[in-house]
């Protein structure tokens, strides 16, 4: 009986520790990792509740200049961001929104097969240990630290400062813009509605959440 109690206690301790790592923003608060767009947003806005939020993909990152705006919205633009990302952030309580939510929508933010950034924390499975989920970032830092230590160097990793979201600069002529739109129309505009069903369903959940 004591062995069973001990095993249960160990399992619970591991589960609680993993949960703490998941939600304590360990990587967000460290300068030794390259942060993704969500982590950069968290780093700039450590407050528990974001009163006004502007969500979208890279279009929002580039178009809404938070530091030059007086509107007070948190720029939650994410590279490869889709509506299901926003819903998972809300549902899994990775963000808390106060009074306003603005969503920048286009066909890519609603496209179910659009590739995503696998390091976003809401992609972590419930049964997946945090250290394993972040293995691609932890492993190189640990092995590099050991190599430096063996060579008599300081094992401290390189600091990645400062870190900003990538902004896509550039301009197109009318002809180039027209050609680009034609390409997008050929690739996306005639897709069946099933290709957007998951994100549309997530949008409905977000609307219901806001209405509540």
Briefly describe each language-model feature range:
Residues 23-46:
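Alpha-helical transmembrane signal-anchor/signal-peptide segments
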Residues 37-42, 87-89, 203-204:
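A generic local structural motif
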Residues 28-35, 76-81, 193-196:
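Short, flexible loop segments at the rims of nucleotide/cofactor-binding pockets, characterized by
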Residues 13, 207-212:
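Extended hydrophobic/aromatic segments used for targeting, binding, or gating
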Residues 54, 59-138:
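Membrane-embedded segments
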Residues 2-25:
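Hydrophobic membrane-insertion alpha-helices, especially the h-region
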Residues 105, 114-209:
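Secreted/periplasmic serine-hydrolase-like ester/acetyl group-modifying domain
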């Amino acid at each position: 009986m004591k062995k069973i109690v001990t095993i249960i206690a160990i399992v619970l301790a591991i589960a609680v520790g993993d949960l703490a790592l998941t939600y304590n923003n360990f990587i967000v608060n460290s300068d030794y990792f390259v942060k993704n767009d969500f982590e950069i947003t968290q780093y700039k806005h450590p407050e528990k509740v974001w009163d006004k939020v502007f969500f979208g993909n890279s279009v929002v990152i580039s178009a809404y200049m938070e530091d030059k705006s007086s509107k007070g919205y948190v720029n939650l633009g994410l590279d490869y961001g889709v509506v299901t990302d926003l819903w998972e952030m809300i549902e899994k309580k990775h963000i808390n929104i106060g009074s306003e939510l603005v969503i920048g929508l286009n066909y890519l933010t609603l496209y179910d097969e659009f590739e995503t950034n696998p390091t976003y924390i809401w992609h972590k499975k419930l049964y997946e240990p945090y250290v394993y989920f972040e293995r691609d970032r932890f492993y190189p830092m640990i092995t590099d630290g050991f190599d430096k230590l063996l060579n008599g160097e300081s094992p401290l990793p390189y600091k990645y400062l400062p870190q900003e979201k990538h902004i896509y600069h550039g301009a197109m002529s009318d002809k180039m813009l027209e050609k680009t739109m034609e390409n997008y129309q050929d690739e996306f505009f005639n897709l069946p509605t099933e290709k957007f069903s998951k994100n549309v369903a997530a949008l409905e959940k977000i609307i219901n959440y806001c209405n509540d």
